[in-house]
Regions:
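Sec-dependent N-terminal signal peptides
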Residues: 4-12
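Boundary at the C-terminal end of the N-terminal hydrophobic targeting segment
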Residues: 18-20
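Glycine-rich nucleotide/cofactor/substrate-binding loop typically near the N-terminus or early
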Residues: 26, 51-140
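Structural recognition of the beta-strand scaffold that forms the well-ordered cores
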Residues: 29-33, 60-64, 147-150
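Second-shell loop/turn segments in exported
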Residues: 32-37, 119-120, 145-146
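Histidine-anchored nucleotide/phosphate-binding helix
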Residues: 45-53, 161
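Internal, conserved structured core segments that host functional sites
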Residues: 123-167
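Single conserved hydrophobic/aromatic residue that forms the stacking wall/gate
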Residues: 172-180
């Protein structure tokens, strides 16, 4: 009888573990660039909505970006919304699993390009946000795609792409062997 009970306990534990693994693999990886902190209230509303859904999405970056003009660093505005989310996080955790901790969210808030438009892209214009994008995409242990949501300016994403294009492996051949 003990063997039968152990067997059923083992099967139950294994199925629960398997479901948890599948659920985690089904979560999409997301990095958001946002110009939150301007005069548009929908940016704050969108960030709140995203955080409320963060138990079903792996948020891997919250990046302050510039849109039309060079603005001061607005990561403090993102931090403000995250801290307010932290106040309700214990109640959310009572009703659903999978929410990131407040410390996890704090760690992924980064500043994007300080200059607006394509003036913020090129040699020597890396930012903590563009570096975060590259490091998240380069994670070897996680092969899921990374979704980039541009809620504001896209030049931080452009800088990450620029750097990868200009610093990764390049091929130069000194002769035209093998029909290259």
């Amino acid at each position: 009888m003990k063997k039968v009970l152990f067997f059923f306990f083992f099967l139950t534990a294994w199925s629960l573990y398997s479901e948890a693994q599948v659920a985690n693999e089904d979560k999409h990886r997301l990095i958001v660039t946002t110009d939150l902190g301007g005069t548009d209230p929908d940016d704050i509303q969108s960030m709140i909505h995203l955080l409320l859904c963060s138990n079903v999405i792996d948020i891997e970056g919250l990046i302050s970006s510039q849109v039309w003009m060079d603005d001061p660093d607005k990561t403090a505005k993102i931090s403000e919304v995250v801290e307010q989310f932290g106040e309700v996080l214990p109640r959310l955790n009572k009703h659903a699993e999978g929410y990131p901790s407040l410390n996890q969210l704090r760690a992924i808030i980064k500043r994007g390009q300080p200059s607006s438009n394509m003036t913020g892209v090129g040699q020597g214009k890396d930012s903590p946000g563009s570096e975060l994008i590259i490091s998240v995409v380069d994670k070897k242990k996680d092969q899921r795609s990374v979704w980039l949501a541009a809620w504001g300016g896209m030049n931080t994403i452009a800088q990450a792409l620029w750097k990868v294009k200009h610093t990764r492996c390049l091929l130069y051949t000194s002769d035209a062997a093998d029909d290259l």
